[in-house]
Amino acid sequence: MDLIEYFERQKQRCERELRYSEAPGFQLFERTPQGQHDITEQHIQELREARDQYQRTIDYLKTQG
């Protein structure tokens, strides 16, 4: 597997996870000593940023030939 293929797979993984995370009713919680916190929006934002970074990396690798 080359680098482009690796990053394309990672991007696809993010996109799949985003589909589930953006579904109505989906919630993601984190337990801390202070209690339970809803981190759904933070999780979605991190997935979007990762997906975009993977795409930038793919584009860069393609230009480098």
Residue ranges: model-predicted function:
Residues 1-16:
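Short, charge/polar-rich alpha-helical segments
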Residues 13, 19-64:
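Short, charge-rich amphipathic interface segments used for partner binding and complex assembly
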